Amino acid sequence: MKDFEFFAPKTLEEAKGLLHQYKDVPPAIIAGGTDLVIEINDRWEKPDVVIDIKKLKELEYIRVEENTIHIGALSTFTQIENHPFIRSHVRALYKAASQVGSPQIRNLGTIGGNLSTSSVAGDGVSAMTTLDATVVLESVRGTRQMKLTDFFDGEGFKRRNALEADEIMTEVIIDRPDAHSASAFYKLAKRKSLAISVIGGGMAVKVDDAGVCTWASMRGGCIGRYPLHFKQAEEMLVGAPLTMETMEATLPILHDTVYDMARARPSVLYKKESVQGVFKKLFVDILDQLEGGCNE
């Protein structure tokens, strides 16, 4: 391991100042360290400057407001998993948070780190994309908000997302669900814990008083560089009564979309079939919630 300069700012303003000061290096940010420490030990990352932001307690919160939920970037997966409102009302996020790594990893890993790392297999990435999340990025230059999907499409200093070298993700915002909405997440993996997703499927819907779908979001993680958008399947659901029959009618579209996206990969033969099984489980969960079933 090479030597590097290490800083542990106590305030967000101090952290932004350090990021600006060393932006040309550029610095590596560490929070939980569940990704960066491994990358440094394996010599994938060789930073000259490391900024530890774990002391920034001002970024560690979950705030439920009238129409939105605000999650500080330093909120751990354990904190998200154990939050009463998220557990009972935001099932996609609860399920994703509860299946990240192991209890030890969930105690350290943060939602901001998960999204900023932008791993293909990130459970938080799949869930938050499904929920149409917005992220907040801050620097001494100012603050900007963008949809998570736009964040992933950006080309920042690491070319993996829109984050610039002097920026820090401070918050994630999602819509607060109501009685006419539901979300679900299912992680297909080789083991029940300490496993990387094979497919991380996410689904969210809104319906009217008659049970007709007014909005749908369907995403498949670990299929492409970022969660695959099943846009054609969503369009089939919107305007139709949300029943098992109408949802299962989208399965051939899911199959074909995965094949078209990943046909050059050896895993496509497995994933184009298994994605249908993943979403069948999501359909059951969605209907259970809309019909007043158990949210646990």
Curated annotation (Swiss-Prot):
Entry-linked InterPro entries: CO_DH_flav_C, CO_DH_flav_C_dom_sf, Diverse_Substr_Oxidored, FAD-bd_PCMH, FAD-bd_PCMH-like_sf, FAD-bd_PCMH_sub1, FAD-bd_PCMH_sub2, Mopterin_DH_FAD-bd
Alphabetized Pfam families for the sequence: CO_deh_flav_C, FAD_binding_5
Binding site for FAD: 29-36, 101, 110-114, 123, 160, 169, 187
UniProt cofactor(s): FAD
Regions that span the bilayer: none
Description of pH dependence: Most stable at pH 8.0. Unstable at acidic pH values.
UniProt entry tagged with the keyword Glycoprotein: no
Single biological process term from Gene Ontology: nicotinate catabolic process
Cofactor info, note text: Binds 1 FAD per subunit.
Domain of life, source organism: Bacteria
Pathway: Cofactor degradation; nicotinate degradation; 6-hydroxynicotinate from nicotinate: step 1/1
Swiss-Prot/TrEMBL keywords: FAD, Flavoprotein, NADP, Oxidoreductase
Means of activity regulation: Reversibly inactivated by selenide and sulfide. Not inhibited by cyanide.
Positions of the FAD-binding PCMH-type domain: 1-179
EC number: 1.17.1.5
One Gene Ontology term of the molecular function aspect: FAD binding
Catalytic activity: nicotinate + NADP(+) + H2O = 6-hydroxynicotinate + NADPH + H(+)
PANTHER family: XANTHINE DEHYDROGENASE FAD-BINDING SUBUNIT XDHB-RELATED, XANTHINE DEHYDROGENASE SUBUNIT C-RELATED
Functional note: Catalyzes the hydroxylation of nicotinate to 6-hydroxynicotinate. Also active against 2-pyrazinecarboxylic acid, but inactive against other nicotinate analogs.
Complex and partners: Heterooctamer of NDHM, NDHL, NDHS and NDHF. Dimer of heterotetramers.
Name by which UniProt lists this protein: Nicotinate dehydrogenase FAD-subunit
